[in-house]
Amino acid sequence: MAFKDLRDFIALLEEKGQLKRISHPVDPYLEITEISDRTLRAGGPALLFENVVGHTTPVLANLFGTPDRVAMGMGQENVGALREVGELLAFLKEPEPPKGMKDAWEKLPIFKQVLNMAPKLIKNAPCQEFEVSGEDVDLTAIPIQTCWPGDAAPLVTWPLVVTKGPHKDRQNLGIYRMQLIGKNKLIMRWLSHRGGALDFREWQQQHPGENFPVSVALGADPATILGAVTPVPDTLSEYAFAGLLRGSKTEVTKSRGNDLQVPASAEYILEGHIAPGEMADEGPFGDHTGYYNEVDSFPVFTVERITHRKDPIYHSTYTGRPPDEPAVLGVALNEVFVPILKKQFPEIVDFYLPPEGCSYRMAVVTMKKQYPGHAKRVMLGVWSFLRQFMYTKFVIVTDDDVNARDWNDVIWALTTRVDPMRDTTMIDNTPIDYLDFASPVSGLGSKMGIDATNKWPGETNREWGTTIEMTAEVKNKVDAIWDKLGIDDK
């Protein structure tokens, strides 16, 4: 499945009964959130609100509201197929040298495919069919959602922010929410370690006192959107990765007011700058934790120009207590993470981010334990290997006889294989999500690792328990006579 733009994806979803057009008048103030939330929790379709109160532009919501739709957006038939995407990323992250001529020939197509996926620069792009600039810029004309009753303002939730540092060979694509504070002003909420913030910091050092150019795409094609939230190796651009997912080069075009390249098929492009020293208080907003976050100061993005397609569609979402779209994305991307982790730690059998853990705050790992202390090595490896797990507060490691995705199994392992004093690892003063108000200091807190594996000699002085298992002979015998017993008869 290859989607040139968001509209291609919408058409396929509608064909498969996975998109619902809503003609009834719906308000972007709170109502779209409530409808989307109920639909997502029921495993329902993507929603295209065609009659948005106060606006002529339709709103697309709940696009990635099921793991299968995430997989479809990444060009795969189902969630299980995302393991193949993870295997490709694992190879690209740490490619192994060929073991011989035959191996070299087998790997050659992969390298050629990657090299051939550099974005394609085009002119006369659909995203630039129409333009408003200067005094005519009016962000309030876009049906930006106000998601929750306590939110400070309307919030842009699916912006693909394009930046480039002065010393970087390639652009950074990141998704950072943006609060509307004026007809041409948005607050850019990027945390200090994120790519956009790092680019901005380098720019200020290289060009003190100068405005930092920024472009933002709204409503890009699904592969490009999902490429921006996937752990792409530093050697591969998000545009190139989107091309690999799509099977064709990502078409980009040069912004009209700066040199940044933006997705050519996006519904909207916002062009502008961040002026040095221009900051504003952002929030509070309801977030993926299920709570309102604290107010904090972030840079202001001044929009100088808006270009858009004919009859544009505004792509939006909300975040709230799981399940929400970020949690669903986490479930799907979980399958991408597994091969990447297993390449670094072959002893890992499965890795699971429970969606109720706010996408990434808790991880469960099952492994083939090989020596005393092995579980601790794995938990420390999870925290340090991918930047996506830097904010994971709890890591539970257990044996491969436990199903990481079954809480009955996990709780059994925790309560039977763990001594809290011996098997708990606490790490203080580590990076924590700024939205985590439970930490004593904003952005800095502790982590807990729990070793729920069977203990080896050296880890305990006691005789370890043996699990109870029925013999295969008896199981087979009962299977053969089960229907005759009449137990399942109603």
Swiss-Prot record:
It is a peripheral membrane protein. One of its GO terms (cellular component) is plasma membrane. It holds the Pfam family UbiD_N. Binds 1 prenylated FMN per subunit. The active site is at 287 (proton donor). It comes from the Bacteria. This is 3-octaprenyl-4-hydroxybenzoate carboxy-lyase. The gene is ubiD.
